[in-house]
Design a protein with these regions (language model features):
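Terminal, low-structured helical/coil segments at or just beyond the last alpha-helical repeat
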Residues: 18-29, 118-151
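Alpha-helical segment of the N-proximal tetratricopeptide repeat
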Residues: 26-56
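Register position in tetratricopeptide repeats
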Residues: 40-41, 74-76, 110, 142-149
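Structural signature of tandem alpha-helical TPR/SEL1-like repeats
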Residues: 41-49, 76-89, 112-123
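Canonical tetratricopeptide repeat
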Residues: 67, 103, 139-142
Length: 151
């Protein structure tokens, strides 16, 4: 009798479980796409949420650390300490990460440390093999603008 009762309870719970809707958890790629869309719209809150979820799920994802740092730097009240933390993590995970070199260089300019930005510009020249890659060009322009504004 106990076996029959246990079987009926188990069967009932399986039927009940079948009625519960399945939640689709976004994949890392979906979260990164959502974060990039949010960044394009300057929706820093959503971008930070999505990239933080990716970092939590994949702590060794250099792209996620780079984008999370970017959101900390670009939000209304920049948090450069958090930005530097995640840029450095991205570069530790992937020392050749061109985007992280560009963005940490720009963060150093915000922090009034142009010599540090120049070091990352030099790193980009080596990584790119020339001065033509987009990341090098963007950081070079930011550095030139900084020097013009701060003679």
């Amino acid at each position: 009798m106990k076996k029959i009762l246990a079987t009926m309870m188990l069967a009932g719970s399986i039927v009940h479980a079948a009625d519960v809707p399945v939640m689709n958890v976004p994949t890392v790629n979906q979260r990164m796409k959502s974060a990039r869309t949010a960044i394009a719209q300057s929706d820093w809150r959503t971008a930070k949420f999505e990239t933080q979820k990716v970092v939590d799920e994949e702590p060794s994802n250099a792209d996620a650390h780079n984008l999370l740092a970017y959101t900390y730097r670009k939000q209304e009240k920049p948090d450069l300490a958090k930005a530097f933390e995640h840029y450095k993590t991205a570069l530790k995970l992937n020392p050749q990460h061109k985007g992280a070199h560009e963005y940490i260089g720009e963060a150093y300019l915000m922090d009034r440390k142009p010599a540090m930005a120049e070091q990352h510009l030099s790193d980009l020249e080596k990584i790119c093999g020339n001065r033509q890659c987009e990341e090098y060009q963007d950081l070079a322009k930011a550095l030139a603008a900084y020097r013009k504004a701060n003679p």
